[in-house]
From Swiss-Prot:
Component of the SWI5-SFR1 complex. Interacts with RAD51; the interaction is weak. Interacts with ESR1 in a ligand-independent and ligand-dependent manner. It is found in: Nucleus. The lineage of its organism: Eukaryota, Metazoa, Chordata, Craniata, Vertebrata. InterPro entries: SFR1 (IPR042429), SFR1/Mei5 (IPR018468). This is Swi5-dependent recombination DNA repair protein 1 homolog. It holds the Pfam family Mei5. One of its GO terms (biological process) is double-strand break repair via homologous recombination. Residues 136-146 have a biased composition (Polar residues). GO terms for cellular component: nucleus; Swi5-Sfr1 complex. It comes from the Eukaryota. Keywords: Coiled coil, DNA damage, DNA repair, Nucleus, Phosphoprotein, Transcription, Transcription regulation.
Length: 251
């Protein structure tokens, strides 16, 4: 019984040749060989032995059996074909989400590439903005530094100018005095000048002594010469006054 399905196609070909239907059945049997194995698996082996032993024209019963077998085999093959078509449709439906996912992945990859391409441009624009802001900051700081340095330089120049003007005035005064002394020495004799100075010193000393006597009589207290000199703001060296002894020297 297990070897009968494998011998079915050969017996069917022999029977078709004997009946004169070889050309019409060849095209159908090529597609239905697989189905026929399942259909003819239920027939007894004696029937197939009868086909092999007697290569005679088929009887009516055999023809009817063949027709029944062909009729029963057609829907089975149609079921198989339908299953194949459904499987192909399922494969297509399964493949379509995969393709859509692939398309989504491709679109995501393209977007990521575009974002990566745009990132350097953004970074370059940000770098440009930062460099421009830094250059502006450095420029403003340099301008402020220049202004501060210029102000300090101007201030120092003003101070030096005022100092120089004071020194010039002092030198001019000293020069004027020296010129006066020279002029007096040219016009007058030095000995005469010394005599005049001595006379003026003696007059000053006498005047202070008289003031001391007058003021002490009014106040009933004797005033010292140092108090009178300090009161009038007279230089001790000009009058040759000695504070320790409270006397005039060289009188």
């Amino acid at each position: 019984m297990a070897s009968a399905p494998s011998d079915i196609p050969e017996n069917a070909f022999r029977l078709a040749k004997a009946s004169g239907r070889c050309q019409s059945m060849m095209s159908q049997m090529k597609d239905e060989t697989k189905c026929m194995g399942a259909v003819f698996s239920g027939y007894p082996t004696a029937l197939w032995l009868e086909y092999e032993v007697s290569p005679q024209p088929m009887s009516g019963t055999l023809k009817e059996r063949l027709k029944k077998a062909r009729a029963s085999s057609q829907p089975f093959c149609s079921v198989v074909k339908r299953i194949k078509v459904e499987n192909e449709e399922n494969d297509q439906t399964l493949s379509e989400p995969g393709e859509s996912s692939k398309e989504e992945n491709c679109s995501k990859a393209q977007e990521s590439l575009e974002n990566k391409d745009n990132e350097p441009e953004k970074e370059s624009s940000e770098d440009k903005n930062t460099s421009e802001s830094k250059s502006l900051d450095t420029g403003s700081s340099s301008v402020l530094q220049k202004d501060s340095t210029e102000k300090t330089i101007k201030q120092t120049l003003k101070e030096e100018k005022a100092k120089l003007t004071r020194q010039v005035q002092e030198k001019e005064d000293l020069l004027r005095r020296l010129k006066l002394v020279k002029m007096y020495r040219i016009k007058n004799d030095v000995t005469e000048l010394e005599d005049l100075i001595k006379k003026w010193r003696r007059c000053g000393q006498r005047l202070l002594c008289e003031l001391q006597s007058i003021m002490s009589e009014d106040e009933d207290e004797k005033l010292t010469l140092t108090e009178l000199i300090d009161y009038y703001g007279i230089d001790d060296k000009l009058l040759h006054y000695n504070r320790t002894e409270e006397e005039f020297t060289g009188v």
